[in-house]
Curated annotation (Swiss-Prot):
Belongs to the Integrator subunit 4 family. Coiled coil: none annotated. Residues 818-840 are annotated as: Disordered. It comes from the Eukaryota. The keyword Repeat does not apply. InterPro entries: ARM-like, ARM-type_fold, INTS4_8HBD. GO terms for cellular component: INTAC complex; integrator complex; nucleus. This is Integrator complex subunit 4. GO terms for molecular function: inositol hexakisphosphate binding. The keyword Lipoprotein does not apply. Component of the integrator complex, a multiprotein complex that terminates RNA polymerase II (Pol II) transcription in the promoter-proximal region of genes. The integrator complex provides a quality checkpoint during transcription elongation by driving premature transcription termination of transcripts that are unfavorably configured for transcriptional elongation: the complex terminates transcription by (1) catalyzing dephosphorylation of the C-terminal domain (CTD) of Pol II subunit Polr2A/Rbp1 and Spt5, and (2) degrading the exiting nascent RNA transcript via endonuclease activity. 1D-myo-inositol hexakisphosphate binds at T148, K184.
Amino acid sequence: MALAIKKRVGTYVETVDGSPPVKKLRLQTLAADAKGGKSGKVGNVERKLTALNQLDAYVGNLPAGALVLPTGTPVASTGAPSTGVIGNPPAAATGAPPMTAANSRELLELLVKITDEISYEDVEMGELKEVASKIFQLYQLQERDSDTSIRVKLLELLSGLGCECATEQALTMIIDYFIFLLRKEVSQKVLAQGMMCLFRIGERRKHMLPISYKTQVAHLAKEQLRSGSAHTQKNAMLVIGRFATKMEGERHYVWKLAFYIDSQDSSVRAQALHALLTLGERGSQLPAVLYKRAVEAMKDDYECVRKEALQLVFMLGNRHPDYILPSDRQQEELRMIDAAFSKVCEALCDLSLQIRVLAAELLGGMTAVSREFLHQTLDKKLMSNLRRKRTAHERGARLVASGEWSSGKRWADDAPQEHLDAQSISIIASGACGALIHGLEDEFLEVRTAAVASMCKLALSRPDFAVTSLDFLVDMFNDEIEDVRLKAIYSLTAIAKHIVLREDQLEIMLGSLEDYSVDVREGLHLMLGACRVSTQTCLLMVVQKLLDVLAKYPQDRNSTYACMRKIGQKHPHLVMAVAVHLLYVHPFFETPERDVEDPAYLCVLILVFNAAEHLVPIISLLPTATHRHYAYLRDSMPNLVPQLPIEGASSASATHRIDSAMHQAGSSAEYLQMILSHIEEIFTMTDERLELLQTAQSNLQRLGSIDAGMYGTSNFLETFLAAQIQIEQMQRCASTQRSRVPLKESLAALIRNCLKLQHTFSGLNYGDILQVKQLRLRACALHLVLVVRDRSQSALGPCQMLLQTAGDISEFIKANTKDEEEKPPVVETDMPMKESVSRDAQPDSFTRQLLIKLDGISDPKPGRVFREILPLVQQAPPLALPPANDKIRRCVANILEPCPLQSQDNVIKVTAGLIAAVPFVAEIDNLLESQKADMRIKIKYPDQHMHTVVPKQSDFKPIMTEQGEHKTNVRLRTTILLSHSVWTESSLVEIQLCLAVRPGSELELCKPAKVLFAPKPVRRGI
């Protein structure tokens, strides 16, 4: 028996064997959907909006012509009002019962219940007009001195309809209702709620509104700014920021909003600044003269105002960087970006944590600041409010120019001193002076983290600032918080191309290598590989410290190997000078050959070999034993050891054959096209076709192992070809009556290959997905035919799987056809060749005929379906391979811990029945965000007992590179628990990463890691 379960993630429907029986399924094809789509949809809407029918008792019984449209057409004949001239909506009802206090209370309770339960999804135009008209009538019936809560709830219902409008006509009708009702409203509570409802509609559906309606809504909100309610003013500013057009915002609304920056209410001041920011973000040009108002607002007593003012200062500084600001107390003038940078730096001394964090984050975005102001952020010397100190010559010249005389020995020594304003004097450093240092020394980690990030952004744009800030970033390695240390490490990695490390800086960095956190150690390995050192002594310090830490933390070998590889590539001349010392080569005596499996010796070899790639004379310094070790490491670690001209390095015959063919082809892509052309020729043959296809399959597999960039594409085609070969082999069994039915394992392998194509590959275009779905449809049809022929198992499950797969591909084709009709025509010359080919892909004749036959079956029982599709399955031509798509990536995993080399030697011993914790580390490439929830860790014991572990989402962390976080490559670091009853001896336990694509079926992403596990009997006490 079988149960059809529809998977939430994905578009296909799977079948799980062994479940209770369910009702028979019928294929819903394009014709069936088109025939019954309307009725089902209307029923769905009626079910969702039935609750609004309860309002009829409060609206009253209207005569047929009572509700008149602007054009004079009764609603009874149209079913809904039409949108027309604003200000002439449908007239209010006249036959409603009088509204008493009890009725008002009942109506309010009913509206609250409806608001909580109603769903607006898939509302048709006619239904929406009818419901909106009903709400409008009920609103008109409410007296102005009655309870405002009813009108507020009615506006909420109306805004809910507006947020789900699918057409411009329906949306403009809702906006007409809002404008008409709010112009006549006098209650500030209702006006404030109406403004908020318009803002919500603008967030969801503003792109559908015509410009004229946007202007009218913004003008309505502008009128409400004169309201005496602060709540109404705030919501009106929200509406202006959302609806005002770019040109209208610059001409009419900017200065109107700027007027309210001086409002008595702090929330109004903050909202006015926020509305200006919203207009600026939407493209309106904010005038530079607003800068002075924003600076004054930064001194506000309320945090919300200072926060918005700080962002406005930042925006104005970046929008008008070269605008010259006059200075009252100085003769020289400042650029606005420099003045804004100084004000943002001052905010780093604010009492509020949120403002200090925001100021530290904004500093990184002001890259146009002058060099002098930027470097002042790292100098804590006290300055006189950023006033430039004048030389004695300049001061004397100024006295002479003044023409004043004094009785003393100096010019103007009796002149009155400069008048000092008490507010301009600051005991601490002001302006940009020492601002980043204050941020790095803040007591809260959020400020320190933001300051480190901003320092990194500024250093990336200014190489001279990167050199100056290096010492301060290195000091952050000693921070007490791990996240701050990691941020400093990754920031230094990003600016590594601009700096060269000194010996004193290396001492602090290398001291952090002994950190207990594995993330910090791996981050330091990445950073050391990206940086450059200045001397041989520094290089020896780094290498020796890495080897010492590797002996202490052997689990860091992979990141240490990668670090040694990068160091060798960046310092070939320094490595050449110390290579003899690192390899213990004596000038007179022959040293003993070292163990090639020693991790420390491996690190040195990786360092030397990668340096020799850029400086070939290093090879002459290597002893003979090292040449043999190179041949071994080149085969075992090809990603860490480069190709070198060393004699004795052998290669396998298959590799040599593929390499020579690729060399003749010119590139991997050309060689792949050559393989695909050969496969097309093979499909035209009749004799020995399977053997040739298997040879092409091995060539595709080998191509992916040689060229990492083509791995996803070649593996996708190889898996597709493997499924084709399996289908062709099973098709021969279905062609004759006497043929032996394949085993269940063969059918399961075919279905597994189809699932791999569907779930482990990303970057597929429409043509690739269509070919995969057609392949799965063929596999399901063949599965049903073979199961019915076998007669030893139920065919209900395969039959349902075939119907569901056919329905899935039918919906997929229908959806793509609908999208193509809605898209505007595209000029073929502007479209890439691959995209045009994939978009024009059509299902083959087998798929079309099979869908037609399944659609014609009224009662799809397995026997009848079998008889209908048997001729098609027996005569099905081979399915063409999809064209090569270089954007395809495959999700693969590599288990780092437990290590296969050490797990055979270290036996995990535990008392039987108790739990042993085993660290588990794996790197997963090309993992989509939606696939993280489907990741599983499968543990298989020697007695074939298995259990599956679901890792936590927090255990997935992106892999860091020199360019930052990798988008699709993640590292899974967790702990798995092993437990079992007593065994006689230690046995292997297999640990594997899988992707759960359907209940009871997982796709393996890597080879299993094996650990020796020995549960011992419990010791009995005396």
